[in-house]
């Protein structure tokens, strides 16, 4: 095996997806703790003290207890190198989550046992399904009274349309929660909330008399449950899992550390190493000798002391070496990357090398955009980083007119990293913001104040939807001349039609048949 093949086989790059409050941030912390990456699992409930969850580092996230940016964390576990991408937990940030899901090879879906499948989970799973992403399921909060496990599996199968293959099975729930049975190891792990790793004892075999000693009549209930589960549920099928058709299911309680290590072991044992990536011209294999990668996220001011911008790049093929010359395909320029970094949320360190599956950060001053491809020279363009038409719009006004330049710079940077979309109508000097959800405006206002020293006022803007305009240049000029207040340039200087309502949108579509009005576009 070549060094490249060896490093590829060791990589596991995955994201955690869930509905808000299903316990995703807690699970992230506990995975890091079991992986030895952090010393204290900084309980989310302790946020009101000074200790905040490792992956929630932005000021607004600390105040509200939600993740609004995607964090990247790398740590070794067993013989593997784990790249864990935490995703925004609030429904307003589905676009950032979508972009993050383009950079992973698998995902862990967290389901709250009390609430079952929720709206955001459905949306995110649909995104995973578009790419056939393999999904492990962690059913969380078994220490609370929730839905029956068999009902939860039925719900996942019927609502999400994915087969479930239980790998562990819970013994009771809430106050009667005693642990889980491992269906493929024939072992029982007993739950103890006081034990450091959540597990009091592990025994082998359903017929072990120690089982009856420890849980009494629940032992016979468990034996009956397992007989039923083995007969009624799907057996684990590696091929079905890797093609996104089946999800292995684990039960646990992340807040009590229980079931987390089994999940982390499954990431190592079941999840795929880096996979081939589609580009416009061809499929790129991870073990190709030449380096390639794409930018799936840009984050400004990760450390306000440094006033920096970091482009998060997923390595797709070959090996990255510090100081190597790479081609920024969009501009055709060759760059030397001497200061690439790896992450543990806000903590960062300079890296000398990176392999397929790894995420590296490239510091820059606004010269790198979302979706850009980097290679050793080939004119590749990786596909699939989307930008969606916003559903909410605001007009940005500034309290202090002397700070208009800071406002323009701040909005341009925040738009380039994907925190919001910025539109400048062809007539006038208005700055219009578009967002998938209204919380994004709060985030933008907070960041403008904290990072750029600008107080902004957002006013309602009369716009129902936006559409990117492609097609005949002459018709585009006619449209722009006639409706200059409604045609705007976005952050990448692409033309956009800002429709006051659907009647106007349908009217211009009829009037300009050689133009296409697109709801989404690829960023690059």
UniProtKB/Swiss-Prot annotation:
Name under which the protein is recorded: Peptide chain release factor 3
GO cellular component, one term: cytosol
Residues making up the signal peptide according to the UniProt record: none
Positions that bind GTP: 18-25, 86-90, 140-143
UniProt-listed GO biological process terms: regulation of translational termination
Family: Belongs to the TRAFAC class translation factor GTPase superfamily. Classic translation factor GTPase family. PrfC subfamily.
MF annotations from Gene Ontology: GTP binding; GTPase activity; translation release factor activity, codon nonspecific; translation release factor activity, codon specific
Lineage: Bacteria, Pseudomonadati, Pseudomonadota, Betaproteobacteria, Rhodocyclales
Domain tr-type G, first and last residues per copy: 9-275
Main location: cytoplasm
Entry's localization field: Cytoplasm
Keywords: Cytoplasm, GTP-binding, Nucleotide-binding, Protein biosynthesis
Cystine connections: none
Protein's job: Increases the formation of ribosomal termination complexes and stimulates activities of RF-1 and RF-2. It binds guanine nucleotides and has strong preference for UGA stop codons. It may interact directly with the ribosome. The stimulation of RF-1 and RF-2 is significantly reduced by GTP and GDP, but not by GMP.
């Amino acid at each position: 095996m070549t060094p490249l093949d060896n490093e590829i086989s060791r990589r596991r790059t995955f994201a955690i997806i869930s509905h808000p409050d299903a316990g995703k941030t807690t699970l992230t912390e506990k995975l890091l703790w079991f992986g030895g990456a952090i010393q204290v699992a900084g309980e989310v409930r302790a946020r009101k003290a000074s200790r905040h969850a490792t992956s929630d580092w932005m000021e607004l996230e600390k105040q509200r207890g939600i993740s609004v940016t995607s964090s990247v964390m790398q740590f070794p576990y067993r013989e593997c190198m784990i790249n864990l991408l935490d995703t925004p937990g609030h429904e307003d940030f589905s676009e950032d989550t979508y972009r993050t899901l383009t950079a992973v090879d698998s995902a862990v879906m967290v389901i709250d046992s009390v609430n079952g499948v929720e709206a955001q989970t459905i949306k995110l799973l649909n995104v995973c399904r578009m790419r056939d992403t393999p999904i492990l399921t962690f059913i969380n909060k078994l220490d609370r009274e929730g839905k029956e496990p068999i009902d939860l599996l039925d719900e996942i199968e019927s609502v999400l349309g994915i087969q479930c293959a239980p790998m562990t099975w819970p013994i009771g729930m809430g106050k009667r929660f005693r642990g889980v049975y491992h269906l493929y190891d024939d072992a029982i792990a007993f739950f103890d909330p006081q034990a450091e790793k959540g597990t009091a004892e592990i025994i082998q075999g359903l017929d072990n008399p120690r089982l009856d000693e420890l849980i009494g009549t629940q032992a016979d209930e468990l034996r009956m449950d397992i007989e039923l589960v083995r007969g009624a549920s799907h057996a684990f099928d590696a091929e079905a899992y890797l093609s996104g058709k089946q999800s292995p299911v684990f039960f646990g309680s992340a807040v009590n550390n229980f079931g987390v290590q089994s999940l982390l072991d499954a990431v190592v044992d079941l999840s795929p190493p880096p996979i081939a990536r589609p580009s416009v011209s061809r499929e790129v294999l991870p073990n190709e000798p030449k380096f390639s990668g794409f930018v799936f996220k840009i984050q400004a001011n990760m450390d306000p002391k440094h006033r920096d911008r970091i482009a998060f790049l997923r390595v797709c093929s070959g090996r990255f070496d510090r100081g190597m010359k790479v081609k920024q395909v969009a501009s055709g320029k060759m760059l030397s990357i001497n200061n690439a970094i790896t992450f543990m949320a806000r903590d960062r360190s300079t890296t000398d090398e990176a392999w397929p599956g790894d995420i590296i950060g490239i510091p820059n001053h606004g010269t790198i955009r979302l979706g850009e491809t980097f290679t050793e020279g080939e004119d590749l363009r990786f596909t699939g980083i989307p930008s969606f038409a916003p559903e909410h719009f605001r007009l940005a006004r500034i309290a202090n007119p002397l700070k208009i330049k800071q406002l323009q710079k701040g909005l341009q940077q925040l738009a380039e990293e994907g925190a919001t979309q910025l539109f400048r109508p062809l007539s006038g000097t208005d700055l219009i913001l578009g967002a998938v959800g209204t919380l994004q405006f709060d985030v933008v206002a907070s960041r403008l104040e904290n990072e750029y020293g600008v107080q902004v006022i957002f006013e309602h803007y009369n716009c129902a939807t936006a559409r990117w305009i492609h097609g005949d240049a002459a018709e585009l000029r006619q449209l722009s001349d006639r409706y200059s207040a409604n045609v705007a340039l976005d952050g990448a200087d692409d033309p956009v039609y800002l429709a006051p309502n659907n009647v106007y949108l349908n009217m211009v579509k009829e009037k300009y048949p050689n133009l296409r009005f697109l709801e989404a576009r690829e960023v690059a």
